[in-house]
């Protein structure tokens, strides 16, 4: 930390180097085989926006894999859903607080220290994907299987109608046996942004699907779809939700 602070406080500030020069040096320091780790999901998007502003080449073609250490902390130590502050995680793990928070270098140091404490192999499998750069075509779309669910990230589409007409977006395939499944509850949406489905696998049981429709650049849209095997309780809750939406729509006709 002392070395980094000296570099930031003297050499780099005196030179007053531009972002693109510093970023090129940083990427050279990272080398060929590296992976970003951030506290939360937004940093890589902002980084790549700055890179584009300065006319730099993107980090790669398509979504960038990275570790969202905030998410990994929740998977390893809490309920997998809650998102805590960096200082909360530092306190929880009893990491010494010997440098100030809310500064770029010190927060990076604390994030690395939290990451060092995460040993859960399931958590470490859960890589995230920054979607500033989307898949260019059907072949480069993201398909990844984790310990208990699968994720798919589509290429961009001109509008939601085209997106929700695509066979791959709408497909429900068991991520364990790779069989195409018949939907027991077809895709439905409570709000036009999130879509849900329910399918049955003869070998593995009920599978819940969720599609999140997200905005891309140039007024385009893309899909992030997750599929997960679920139990009877979640099946009943999803069916009840669909019935509730159907009833509300009847009342508003």
Segments predicted by a language model, with ranges:
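DEDD superfamily 3′-5′ metal-dependent exonuclease/proofreading module
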Residues: 15-253
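Single conserved hydrophobic/aromatic residue that forms the stacking wall/gate
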Residues: 1-9, 14
């Amino acid at each position: 930390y002392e070395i980094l602070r000296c570099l930031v406080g003297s050499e780099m500030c005196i030179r007053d180097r531009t972002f693109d020069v510093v970023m090129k040096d940083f990427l050279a320091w990272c080398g060929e085989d590296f992976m970003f780790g951030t506290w939360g999901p937004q940093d890589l998007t902002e980084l790549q926006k700055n890179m584009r502003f300065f006319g730099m080449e993107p980090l790669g073609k398509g979504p960038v894999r990275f570790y969202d250490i905030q998410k990994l902390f929740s998977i390893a130590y809490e309920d997998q859903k809650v998102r805590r502050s960096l200082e909360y995680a530092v306190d929880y793990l009893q990491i010494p607080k010997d440098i100030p928070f809310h500064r770029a270098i010190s927060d990076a140091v604390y994030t690395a220290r939290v990451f060092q404490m995460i040993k859960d192999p399931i958590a470490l499998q859960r890589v995230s994907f920054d979607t500033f750069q989307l898949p260019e075509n059907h072949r480069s779309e993201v398909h990844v299987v984790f310990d208990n669910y699968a994720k798919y990230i589509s290429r961009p589409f001109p509008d939601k109608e085209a997106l929700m007409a695509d066979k791959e977006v709408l497909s429900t395939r068991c991520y364990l046996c790779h069989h195409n499944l018949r939907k027991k509850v077809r895709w439905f949406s409570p709000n036009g942004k999130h879509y849900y489905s329910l399918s049955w696998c003869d070998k593995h049981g009920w599978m819940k699907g969720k599609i999140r429709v997200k905005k891309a650049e140039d007024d385009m849209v893309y899909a992030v779809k997750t599929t997960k095997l679920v139990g009877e309780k979640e099946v009943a809750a999803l069916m009840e939700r669909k019935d509730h939406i159907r009833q509300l729509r009847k009342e508003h006709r």
